[in-house]
């Protein structure tokens, strides 16, 4: 029924629109409006479902795009927060590493100084011992030299002051002293 009414209106509209003999401007305007309404009606009738389907699909696509954009924004926010947190953790770890490195370096420096002092003390002690040994050796050599010189001097004195008769008397006295 709708089709018949629309077809009739179309034919009527076209026939009246084609008639221009005695038409005034208001009638022309009226029939142009009728033709436009008929055209829009036909477009709606034959293409309404497709247009509606297209617009609904487009609306759904736009809504999906908005949802995806919101999800991507949330994901980006989470990633940004994670990156900030990791940056803070990295800064903290860096500060801790620097602190530990400084403490370790200080301990190593103190340990090295302590070892150097111990080595210096050992070297001093060894030097003192070496000096004492050398002093004792020198004293022993001096004593030996002094004894040898004293013996030489004694021999020369005895040889010069003792003659054979004095020597015999001295031997006899020594033997008597040993017998007693």
UniProtKB/Swiss-Prot annotation:
Chief location: membrane
InterPro entries, A to Z: ATP_synth_b/b'su_bac/chlpt
Entry's localization field: Cell inner membrane
GO molecular function terms attached to this record: proton-transporting ATP synthase activity, rotational mechanism
Keywords from the named record: ATP synthesis, Cell inner membrane, Cell membrane, CF(0), Hydrogen ion transport, Ion transport, Membrane, Transmembrane, Transmembrane helix, Transport
Membrane topology summary: Single-pass membrane protein
Keyword Transport assigned: yes
Pfam families: ATP-synt_B
Segments passing through the bilayer: 26-48
Entry GO CC: plasma membrane; proton-transporting ATP synthase complex
Family from the record: Belongs to the ATPase B chain family.
Protein task: F(1)F(0) ATP synthase produces ATP from ADP in the presence of a proton or sodium gradient. F-type ATPases consist of two structural domains, F(1) containing the extramembraneous catalytic core and F(0) containing the membrane proton channel, linked together by a central stalk and a peripheral stalk. During catalysis, ATP synthesis in the catalytic domain of F(1) is coupled via a rotary mechanism of the central stalk subunits to proton translocation. Component of the F(0) channel, it forms part of the peripheral stalk, linking F(1) to F(0).
Record text on subunit structure and interactions: F-type ATPases have 2 components, F(1) - the catalytic core - and F(0) - the membrane proton channel. F(1) has five subunits: alpha(3), beta(3), gamma(1), delta(1), epsilon(1). F(0) has three main subunits: a(1), b(2) and c(10-14). The alpha and beta chains form an alternating ring which encloses part of the gamma chain. F(1) is attached to F(0) by a central stalk formed by the gamma and epsilon chains, while a peripheral stalk is formed by the delta and b chains.
Listed name of the protein: ATP synthase subunit b
Species of origin: Sulfurihydrogenibium sp. (strain YO3AOP1)
Lineage, highest ranks first: Bacteria, Pseudomonadati, Aquificota, Aquificia, Aquificales
Encoding gene (name): atpF
């Amino acid at each position: 029924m709708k089709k018949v009414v629309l077809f009739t209106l179309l034919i009527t509209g076209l026939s009246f629109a084609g008639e221009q003999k005695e038409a005034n401007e208001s009638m022309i305007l009226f029939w142009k409006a009728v033709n436009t309404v008929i055209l829009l009606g036909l477009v709606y009738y034959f293409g309404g479902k497709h247009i509606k389907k297209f617009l609904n699909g487009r609306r759904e696509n736009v809504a999906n795009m908005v949802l995806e954009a919101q999800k991507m924004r949330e994901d980006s926010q989470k990633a940004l927060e994670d990156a900030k947190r990791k940056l803070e953790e990295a800064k903290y770890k860096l500060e801790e590493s620097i602190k530990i490195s400084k403490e370790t370096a200080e301990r190593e420096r103190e340990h090295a100084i302590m070892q150097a002092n111990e080595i210096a003390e050992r070297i001093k002690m060894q030097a003192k011992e070496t000096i004492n040994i050398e002093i004792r050796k020198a004293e022993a050599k001096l004593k030996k030299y002094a004894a040898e010189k004293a013996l030489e001097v004694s021999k020369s004195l005895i040889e010069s002051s003792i003659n054979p008769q004095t020597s015999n008397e001295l031997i006899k006295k020594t033997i008597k002293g040993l017998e007693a």
